[in-house]
């Protein structure tokens, strides 16, 4: 019997004395023919490579007990038919049950000694190929005795042993030797054939080609091999040999016939596909694979594989008889530790799945178990899955792998073969690893994974599913603020820019403390009434930088001639000279794009101007905040949605009229103001400015985008010229700004413009025309007559716009510290979003009101018709229809026109409406929940029955403060704080504050008596402190250090109590420290108490101002009870100097100074004692870790040496007298 050595070109032969096996298949030997004869050396003949013929035929003489499907049996049949064994070597049989590596090694060593003559002769044939040799060493001693039943029994045992070791011996690159061969190599008992095999790898390509041909022939001839006899070793055909060769990755210990001595000779040979020693064998390049041939044969392969699985062929791997015999594919057997130490296990795991359906083909007619087992498509455990027909390519690749040298094709075979053998769970494990590699190589294709195997497909699918990452939930990140190399902000929300400019925070200060600025602005926004409303406004483009620079450039006249030239009646002839302002809002860009569609002359200015007017009005509103420019923006706010529809005609004439030589600064601020004013008052200078802007808009889409804010202002001004001047006060409506800030920033402006409602009304009146105009612009470009008439009216009052322009220009430099500042630049467009949102809301409300009015008119018409019908008694139906038609006619055009007019902003308007509606519903639901909770906390009675003689002594932001007598004790005077829940900004805090006060009974905390919920008003009954607040004393008298110490001591006592209960007041200031006539001090206002003192109007208007807040609160950091200690320190400065630090600064700038300046500086520290300065420094430590707590401060010398409470009584009386005199 002859076996091919994979890398060794020299042939070796073994003769079986009991059988005459002939190698009729010289082609197996890479161009050499080996005939083993009785002599010690083999004959070597050079023959051309050719596929074997009739390799599947079996003879009747085949009586080997190996016919039960072992690969050895198949190979023996093949060689018996092909070539006669001329020689006979020692017949050595090995105990089949042992299967140990030691036994196989012993057998291998003996065989090596016997085949020395052949090996020595093989040395002379180094350049020759070698016939394929049987893979691995097999222990078949136990098979030489016993009858057929014994043979069957032995076979089953051997099968178990093979299955047991299948996972341990899975082949890998350079480790394809059987365990016996590996052991022999370890002991340096390597035959010359093996040495030559390691040295000569050049013949592998020829060998792989020949093996491939043999494989193909074997497949084709598979259906022809049929005799269902129990085959013997004599009848084993090349079919078996090819299967063993093809399953290079799954070489088995093959049991031989107990009476046959061939097994002993086979045990000393290695598979031709065996690369040799792992350390020395170099894998040759993979041979080329004929894909076409493989594909053409894939159908046959799949059929034969399926057939073999369908037959009753027993699988050697299905029982545990051969578990004792290790195979290369078995990685999980622990019987051969030396083999695992050979690095075979690591590589075998990667390649164990490559030997798949192999070359062995099942004869379709085979019925006998023995025959079918020999042709089972997979000869190794869990190596060959039954691959469906769609798996053709992988199957072919696998077969090619099997026929070619394992080392050369291992890269291709990785993960190709799926382990679908039902018995090999362990094998599947390694196979899945290989499949994972394959799928990763090919991009985890679903098709690839599915084709590799069902398991691999499921694995790959699961991997794909696991890779998916969910999107963020409830994400509210609206903008990322960064700082560029120049220290300017990038991505700063528009309203933030406006707030910074309005608050007087210079660009230099922003660059010095950029993070602090972002923190304080964020904090300021969080404390605004409706912080969520500002979310819509925070989206803008990075081109705001350019726009901001452009806005800053507005202070200078436009460089492009378009500004001066633009100003024609149509307003569309200007050149795109001033595109430096890019609209910050994406909405604006959309509008501009839509506007671009409009004709450049009329339609573009109108549409773009309407949309740009929206944008510009925001910019202008920013300026107006600094200046009286707000009226225009307010008009636009109310009109914003309708103006988007189509105020083209009004904007076009007005813009042309208003277009003027106005400088960019005047343009930017006055754009809204001047444009609105121009349209409302249309002074020539203002008109010139707005027309230039309008021309720029019409010049080009880009210029329009840049100028959209300008144009929008102009258009809107033209649309509703009359209301613009009064509309200035409407700016506070923008929820992004606090009422106090807006009022402080533009007190004069408020005076000049206080009628945003009329502007909106005018706008609403024009809304109907605007949609029509817009439609006409797209189609006929005809300007509606009503808008033109409206524009002329605005020009009549030119003086106000001129004043506004002058005021704006003068104020612009002040509030915008540097025209070049990016912040200032961005500031101008900042208002766009706010204005847009407010305009959306106002416009929607106006539209609803208009619809309601229309419905009322329709109703009146119907009633009138009905009355007429009653009088006539006939034609009622006609009258009804007429009334219905008349009614329908007016409303239909209005809604229809509105959508077209808002083609650019209609979608935005709808979205804003939906958002507003959702917010209203959410707010309503939340309010209901809060009210329900309050009902459970509050007393259900009527406070009017318990407390009488109510006298109002103060007014807070959400209600009044009253004094009353308790009916049960006339001498007991109580303070009642009445709050309208609808006006309370943070209703949810009321519940917590009531609960805190109920559980806080302390001499230094105002006692909470009761609370009532009456008709939507919350009544909080508290102890009355007749002395008033500490603010009265601070403002009307000068306090000594001893008196200041008393106030601090009593306040610290109350704070210590609150802090011990885990309550942080967070609003310690003089307004919340109350005194009685005896000088006793108590803390009040736990979040819902209104300010009683109306003397200092600034304090009242600055609800929620952070002058007493600790830096950690302003910087939005974590804070604890020590924030109250900082506030106490600020209150000490208030008692010393009469007001807290930064009181004259805007709230936002005060926040900035608190966050950046650290401990505030005293005006005259030298006049103070060491104790108070030390105490004050301890209270005002910026690092709260170094700041003292209430208990520590109570032990300070300044507190222990202070005056008595009675020392405050004179101050309280003086304050009351002065207050009474002031009231008189």
UniProtKB/Swiss-Prot annotation:
Active site residues of this protein: 1067
Biased composition (Low complexity): 57-70, 95-119, 242-251, 343-375, 433-462, 664-677, 690-704, 730-743
GO cellular component: cytoplasm; nucleus
Pro residues biased stretches: 783-801
Catalytic activity: L-seryl-[protein] + ATP = O-phospho-L-seryl-[protein] + ADP + H(+); L-threonyl-[protein] + ATP = O-phospho-L-threonyl-[protein] + ADP + H(+)
Domain Protein kinase: 947-1199
PROSITE patterns noted in UniProt: CRIB (PS50108), PROTEIN_KINASE_ATP (PS00107), PROTEIN_KINASE_DOM (PS50011), PROTEIN_KINASE_ST (PS00108)
EC number: 2.7.11.1
Bias type Polar residues, positions: 1-18, 169-191, 201-218, 231-240, 256-271, 305-324, 544-555, 598-607, 623-636, 744-755, 805-820, 871-886
Gly residues: bias regions: 564-575
SMART domains (alphabetical): PBD, S_TKc
Compartment list: Cytoplasm; Nucleus
Entry keywords, A to Z: ATP-binding, Cytoplasm, Kinase, Nucleotide-binding, Nucleus, Serine/threonine-protein kinase, Transferase
Molecular function via GO: ATP binding; protein serine kinase activity; protein serine/threonine kinase activity
InterPro entries: CRIB_dom (IPR000095), CRIB_dom_sf (IPR036936), Kinase-like_dom_sf (IPR011009), PAK3-like (IPR051931), PAK_BD (IPR033923), Prot_kinase_dom (IPR000719), Protein_kinase_ATP_BS (IPR017441), Ser/Thr_kinase_AS (IPR008271)
Residue span, CRIB domain: 469-482
Residues that hold ATP according to the record: 953-961, 977
Annotated region described as Disordered, given as residue ranges: 1-378, 403-464, 539-825, 861-913
Biased composition (Basic and acidic residues): 144-155, 608-622, 861-870
Protein task: MAP4K component of the MAPK pathway required for the mating pheromone response, and the regulation of cell polarity and cell cycle. Phosphorylates histone H2B to form H2BS10ph. Required for hyphal formation and virulence.
PANTHER family: SERINE/THREONINE-PROTEIN KINASE SAMKA-RELATED-RELATED, SERINE_THREONINE-PROTEIN KINASE SAMKA-RELATED
Similarity annotation: Belongs to the protein kinase superfamily. STE Ser/Thr protein kinase family. STE20 subfamily.
Listed name of the protein: Serine/threonine-protein kinase CST20
Organism: Candida albicans (strain WO-1)
Lineage: Eukaryota, Fungi, Dikarya, Ascomycota, Saccharomycotina
Gene: CST20
């Amino acid at each position: 019997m002859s076996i091919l050595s994979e890398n060794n070109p020299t042939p070796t032969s073994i003769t079986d004395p009991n059988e005459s096996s002939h190698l009729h298949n010289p082609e197996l030997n890479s161009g050499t023919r080996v005939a083993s004869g009785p002599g010690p050396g083999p004959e070597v003949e050079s023959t051309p490579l050719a596929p074997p013929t009739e390799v599947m035929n079996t003879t009747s003489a085949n009586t080997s007990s190996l016919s039960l499907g072992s690969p050895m049996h198949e190979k023996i049949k093949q060689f018996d038919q092909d070539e006669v064994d001329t020689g006979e070597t020692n017949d050595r049989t090995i105990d089949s049950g042992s299967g140990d590596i030691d036994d196989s090694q012993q057998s291998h060593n003996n065989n090596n000694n016997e085949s020395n003559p052949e090996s020595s002769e093989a040395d002379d044939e180094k350049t020759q190929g070698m016939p394929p040799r049987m893979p691995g060493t097999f222990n078949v001693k136990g098979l030489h005795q016993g009858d057929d039943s014994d043979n069957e029994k032995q076979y089953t045992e051997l099968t178990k042993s093979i299955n047991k070791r299948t996972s341990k011996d899975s082949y890998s690159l350079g480790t394809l030797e059987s365990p016996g061969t590996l052991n022999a190599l370890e002991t340096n008992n390597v035959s010359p054939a093996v040495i030559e095999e390691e040295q000569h790898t050049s013949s592998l390509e020829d060998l792989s080609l020949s093996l491939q041909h043999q494989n193909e022939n074997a497949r084709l001839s598979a259906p022809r091999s049929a005799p269902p006899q129990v085959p013997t070793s004599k009848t084993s055909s090349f079919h078996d040999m090819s299967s063993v060769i093809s399953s290079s990755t799954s070489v088995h210990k093959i049991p031989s016939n107990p009476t046959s001595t061939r097994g002993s000779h086979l045990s000393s040979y290695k598979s031709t596909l065996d690369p040799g020693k792992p350390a020395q064998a170099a894998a040759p390049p993979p041979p080329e694979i004929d894909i076409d041939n493989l594909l053409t044969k894939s159908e046959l392969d799949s059929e034969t594989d399926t057939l073999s699985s369908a037959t009753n062929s027993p699988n050697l791997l299905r029982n545990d008889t051969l578990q004792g015999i290790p195979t290369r594919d078995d990685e999980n057997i622990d019987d051969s530790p030396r083999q695992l130490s050979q690095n075979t296990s690591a590589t075998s795991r990667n390649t164990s799945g490559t030997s798949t359906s192999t070359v062995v083909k099942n004869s379709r007619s085979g019925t006998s178990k023995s025959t079918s087992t020999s042709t089972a498509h997979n000869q190794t455990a869990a190596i060959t899955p039954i691959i469906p027909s769609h798996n053709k390519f992988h199957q072919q690749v696998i077969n090619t792998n099997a026929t070619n040298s394992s080392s050369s094709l291992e890269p291709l075979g990785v993960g190709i073969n799926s382990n679908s053998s039902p018995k090999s769970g362990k094998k599947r494990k390694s196979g899945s690893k290989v499949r994972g590699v394959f799928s990763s190589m090919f991009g985890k294709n679903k098709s690839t994974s599915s084709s590799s195997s069902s398991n691999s497909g499921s694995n790959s699918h699961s991997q794909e599913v696991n890779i998916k990452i969910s999107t963020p939930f409830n994400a509210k990140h609206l903008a990322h603020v960064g700082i560029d190399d120049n220290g300017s902000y990038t991505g700063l929300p528009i309203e933030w820019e406006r707030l910074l400019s309005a608050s007087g925070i210079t660009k230099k200060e922003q660059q010095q403390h950029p993070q602090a600025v972002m923190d304080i602005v964020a904090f300021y926004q969080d404390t605004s009434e409706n912080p969520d409303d500002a979310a819509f406004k925070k989206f803008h483009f990075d081109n705001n930088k350019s726009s901001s620079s452009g806005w800053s450039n507005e202070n200078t006249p436009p460089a492009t001639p378009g500004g001066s030239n633009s100003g024609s009646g149509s307003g569309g002839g200007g050149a795109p000279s001033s595109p430096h302002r890019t609209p910050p809002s994406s909405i604006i860009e959309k509008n501009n794009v839509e506007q671009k569609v409009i004709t450049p002359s009329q339609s573009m200015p109108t549409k773009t101007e309407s949309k740009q007017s929206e944008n510009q009005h925001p910019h202008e509103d920013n300026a107006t905040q600094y200046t009286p420019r707000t009226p225009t923006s307010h008009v636009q706010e109310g009109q914003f949605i309708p103006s988007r529809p189509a105020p083209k005609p009004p904007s076009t004439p007005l813009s042309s009229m208003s277009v003027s030589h106005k400088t960019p600064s005047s343009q930017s601020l006055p754009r809204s103001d001047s444009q609105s004013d121009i349209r409302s008052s249309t002074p020539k200078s203002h008109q010139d400015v707005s027309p230039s802007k309008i021309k720029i808009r019409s010049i080009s889409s880009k210029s329009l985008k840049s100028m959209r804010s300008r144009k929008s202002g102009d258009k809107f001004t033209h649309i509703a010229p009359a209301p613009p001047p009064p509309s200035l006060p409407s700016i506070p409506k923008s929820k992004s700004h606090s009422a106090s800030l807006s009022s402080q920033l533009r007190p004069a402006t408020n005076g000049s413009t206080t009628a945003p409602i009329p502007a909106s009304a005018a706008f609403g009146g024009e809304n109907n025309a605007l949609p029509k105009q817009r439609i006409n612009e797209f189609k006929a470009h005809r300007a509606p007559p009503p808008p033109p008439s409206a524009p002329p009216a605005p020009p009549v009052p030119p003086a106000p716009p001129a004043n506004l322009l002058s005021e704006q220009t003068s104020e612009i430099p002040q509030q915008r510290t540097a025209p070049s500042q990016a912040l200032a630049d961005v500031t101008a467009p900042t208002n766009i979003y706010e204005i847009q949102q407010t305009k959306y809301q106002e416009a929607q409300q106006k539209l609803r009101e208009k619809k309601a009015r229309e419905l009322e008119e329709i109703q009146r018409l119907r009633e009138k018709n009905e009355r007429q019908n009653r009088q006539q008694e006939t034609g009622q139906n006609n009258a009804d229809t007429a009334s219905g038609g008349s009614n329908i006619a007016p409303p239909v055009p209005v809604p229809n026109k509105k959508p077209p007019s808002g083609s650019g902003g209609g979608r935005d308007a709808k979205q804003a409406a939906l958002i507003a509606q959702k917010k209203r519903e959410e707010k309503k639901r939340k309010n209901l929940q809060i009210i329900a909770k309050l009902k459970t906390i509050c007393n259900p009675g009527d406070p009017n029955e318990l407390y009488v003689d109510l006298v109002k002594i103060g007014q807070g932001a959400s209600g009044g403060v009253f004094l009353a007598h308790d009916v049960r004790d006339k001498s007991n005077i109580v303070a009642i704080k009445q709050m309208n829940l609808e006006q309370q900004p943070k209703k949810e805090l009321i519940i917590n504050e009531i609960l805190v006060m109920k559980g806080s009974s302390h001499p230094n905390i105002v006692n909470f008596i009761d609370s009532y919920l009456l008709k939507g008003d919350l009544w909080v009954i508290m102890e009355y402190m007749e002395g008033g607040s500490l603010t009265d004393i601070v403002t009307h008298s000068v306090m000594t250090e001893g008196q200041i110490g008393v106030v601090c001591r009593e306040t610290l006592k109350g704070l210590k109590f609150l802090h011990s209960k885990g309550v942080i007041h967070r609003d310690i200031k003089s307004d919340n420290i109350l005194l009685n006539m005896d000088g006793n001090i108590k803390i009040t206002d736990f979040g819902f108490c209104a300010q009683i003192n109306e003397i200092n109007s600034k304090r009242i208007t600055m609800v929620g101002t952070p002058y007493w807040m600790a830096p950690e609160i302003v910087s939005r950091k974590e804070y604890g009870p020590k924030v109250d200690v900082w506030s106490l320190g600020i209150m000490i400065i208030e008692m010393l100097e009469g007001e807290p630090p930064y009181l004259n600064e805007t709230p936002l700038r005060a926040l900035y100074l608190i966050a950046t300046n650290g401990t505030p500086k005293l005006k005259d520290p030298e006049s103070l004692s060491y104790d108070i300065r030390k105490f004050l420094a301890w209270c005002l430590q910026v690092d709260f870790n170094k700041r003292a707590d209430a208990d520590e401060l109570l032990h300070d010398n300044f507190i222990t040496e202070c005056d008595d409470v009675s020392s405050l009584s004179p101050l309280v009386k003086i304050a009351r007298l002065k207050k009474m005199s002031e009231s008189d």
